[in-house]
């Protein structure tokens, strides 16, 4: 049987994984096997959290709009119902930005749709 030399290939593979796990704590950044496991787990988390990020931002926008609306005696669901019926196509992100950055304009906007 002929000899198979794999030193360079595995060293490059190990180095690649260890570079990806820089900044991890303990053995997760020093030992190849644990680093490889942590790297795979981190990639799974990053994949899942890219999808969760969209949900979380939507929740944040809804919370912000709801808090701003309640100051003027509205309910969030009633407010959205009025928006839909008056064919106003502002999304939750824009409404939240208006409520936070420009409350005067937001107040005028609410009074105009009442």
UniProtKB/Swiss-Prot annotation:
The keyword DNA repair does not apply. This is Large ribosomal subunit protein bL20c. The gene is rpl20. It comes from the Eukaryota. It comes from Tetradesmus obliquus (Green alga). One of its GO terms (biological process) is translation. It is found in: Plastid, Chloroplast. NCBIfam families: rplT_bact. One of its GO terms (molecular function) is structural constituent of ribosome. PROSITE patterns: RIBOSOMAL_L20. GO terms for cellular component: chloroplast; ribonucleoprotein complex; ribosome. PANTHER family: 39S RIBOSOMAL PROTEIN L20.
């Amino acid at each position: 049987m002929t000899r198979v030399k794999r030193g360079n290939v595995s060293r490059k593979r190990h180095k690649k994984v260890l570079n990806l796990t820089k900044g991890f704590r303990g053995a997760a950044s020093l030992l190849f096997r644990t680093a490889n496991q942590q790297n795979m787990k981190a990639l799974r988390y990053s994949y899942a959290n890219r999808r969760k990020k969209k949900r979380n931002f939507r929740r944040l926008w809804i919370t912000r709009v709801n808090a701003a609306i309640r100051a003027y005696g509205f309910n969030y669901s009633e407010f959205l119902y009025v928006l839909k019926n008056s064919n106003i196509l502002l999304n939750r992100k824009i409404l939240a930005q208006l409520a936070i950055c420009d409350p005067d304009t937001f107040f005028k906007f609410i009074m105009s749709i009442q």
